Amino acid sequence: CRIMTAALRGQGIRAVALDIGREEAIRLGKKYVHNDICFPAQIVIGEALAALESGKYDDKDVAIVMGKYVGDCRLTHYGALLRKALDDAGYDHIPILTNDDADSHNMHPGFKLNLASSVKIAFALPMIDVLEELLRKIRPYETVKGSADEAFDKALDLVIDGLEKSGVLGA
């Protein structure tokens, strides 16, 4: 989420990473996403709905950005699920932006992620995967509780800061 935000800001788009889903996001996700859909989809969609319901954002001046994966995972369909949830919740006017080149559901007319942003995301996501793998391996051996998470957060901040200031080479 923070990587996409950094890449979009580099493209001149005002972008904000949403808060991690809590009770309200879970409630909204369960309300607007069918129960047969995986819980992560319900949470992600609930986070977007909770942000809109919070009043922090003008729903006439906002778009929701969601990464898209092509494959067997239901993440492939999160954009379409989000579109349905937004429509059902009364936010049918809010566009959804994805990293998908083929806008088969007409969710983000007129928007294209530029090449520089695509490259930033393509290079940064594996960096985050490595950091997360290290975190999972190191956390059980930490001598000070929370120090592994703190180191992960600092490293992630450095990657994102470098990405925003200097592009791929800075990350």
Language-model features: locations:
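An N-terminal assembly and electron-transfer interface module characteristic of large anaerobic redox
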Residues: 1-171
